[in-house]
Amino acid sequence: MSSVVVVGTQWGDEGKGKITDFLSKKADVVARYQGGDNAGHTIVFNNETYKLHLIPSGIFYSDKKCVIGNGLVVNPKSLVKELKYLHDRGVSTDNLLISNRAHVILPYHQLQDQLEEEAKGDAKVGTTLKGIGPCYMDKAARIGIRMADLLDKETFAEKLKIVLEQKNRMFTKMYDAEAIAFDDIFEEYYAYGQEFAKYVCDTSVVVNDSLDKGEKVLFEGAQGVLLDLDHGTYPFVTSSNASAGGVASGVGVGPARIDHVVGVCKAYTSRVGDGPFPTELFDEIGHQIREVGREYGTTTGRPRRVGWFDSVVVRHSRRTSGLTDLSLNSIDVLTGIETLKICTSYEFNGKQIDEYPASFRDLEACVPVYEELPGWKEDITHIRKFEDLPINAQNYVKRIADLTGISLVTFSVGPGREQTVVLRDLYEEA
């Protein structure tokens, strides 16, 4: 058995898709375990760039099973659109598998998302308005509609009528919005379900059978630990468990079956949306990092907020996700910056703290404590060995590994797969 989890250690957008795609080469199964189409990942394959939101990165390898696990919430319309996007570019999806227990996002979830966000005013969380949160709410309230329901016309109709009655009461009475008609959803979304029905199965059985056979399984996370419902900067978080703990429940495997947990981070920090960000940069350096790093959301197109590397954040992720290995991306983006800074701790109420506060108000009051390191000017995008990096770049990477307490397994000096340098083979170690 050999299984590896890839998890973001910051606020998402760390380059997980790139690393997952890279690790997919040796995997037999690639499985997503949480989230929905609110998070995107960009993959460069055969010199072409693809942007995916739901389908796992391993889809480009026809010999690998690609699993959308039960922990995801799936928008059927988005899924059909993404399947067409791949088919139009000559990519087969015959290797895709979708859990029959995954919950389905329907138009009323998106409307609810929009109305709730508008009602919050200045206290809004900054949701992508994709209906993710409301769908997870229905799941917890036990009124959700799952893939197995969507594919059965009678069951889908029965459940949809019940849920719409509740939702429309809320829309009209609480928000003074228009009701959604049954006919506006039913036939269209039932038809979507029929388009991908051939992919739907009990994916927990598939993944566990693969592990029993000794096959290599890669679990692909979305977002990052700081957006995790329990361990993130609550309430500025997503509605699922983006930490490694989400794998067990989101795919249906026992936690003892996980061998490695790879934490992915950038050589700096970024986030989309509202919420505390202690090391955020508002100056010319921040602008440079954003433009050089193309820091714009894959899903929303929104400019990302950027800042210095925060070791407090990544240590928090190490503890809560049990990180065993570190994958460091986008080192090349920092080229040309004369002096680099790494946050080593926070100052809060006159005291130095090393752990991440639970209260977002406390976090907003934290002042980062920085350590400065000299930068480098040399172009490093062609580097393929750690020892070939400029000495200042080597020292910067080593300091990140030291401060986070995580052993480096890969680093990247550009967006291409060939620009990822592997220091150890995780599958051989498992």
Swiss-Prot record:
Instruction: Indicate whether Transport appears among the record's keywords.
Output: no
Question: Keywords, A to Z?
Answer: Cytoplasm, GTP-binding, Ligase, Magnesium, Metal-binding, Nucleotide-binding, Purine biosynthesis
Lineage, top-rank taxon, reads: Bacteria
Q: What positions does the entry give for GTP binding?
A: 12-18, 40-42, 304, 330-332, 412-414
Q: For binding Mg(2+), which residues are annotated in this chain's numbering?
A: D13, G40
Where is this protein localized, as stated in its record? Cytoplasm
Q: Can you cite an annotated GO cellular component?
A: cytoplasm
Q: How is the cofactor bound?
A: Binds 1 Mg(2+) ion per subunit.
Q: Which Pfam family is one of those matched by this entry? A: Adenylsucc_synt
Task: Fetch the InterPro entries from UniProt.
Answer: Adenylosuccin_syn_GTP-bd, Adenylosuccin_syn_Lys_AS, Adenylosuccinate_synth_dom1, Adenylosuccinate_synth_dom2, Adenylosuccinate_synth_dom3, Adenylosuccinate_synthetase, P-loop_NTPase
Q: Name one GO biological process term.
A: 'de novo' AMP biosynthetic process
User: What Enzyme Commission number(s) appear in the record?
Assistant: 6.3.4.4
Q: Does the keyword Cell division apply?
A: no
Swiss-Prot/TrEMBL cofactor(s): Mg(2+)
Q: What is its main location?
A: cytoplasm
Q: Which GO terms describe its molecular function?
A: adenylosuccinate synthase activity; GTP binding; magnesium ion binding
Q: In which pathway does it act?
A: Purine metabolism; AMP biosynthesis via de novo pathway; AMP from IMP: step 1/2
Positions binding IMP in this chain are: D13, E14, G15, K16, N38, A39, G40, H41, T128, R142, Q223, T238, R302
Q: Which PANTHER family match?
A: ADENYLOSUCCINATE SYNTHETASE
| Assembly | Homodimer.
Similarity remark: Belongs to the adenylosuccinate synthetase family.
HAMAP family reported in the protein's UniProt record: Adenylosucc_synth (MF_00011)
The identity of this protein, by name, is Adenylosuccinate synthetase
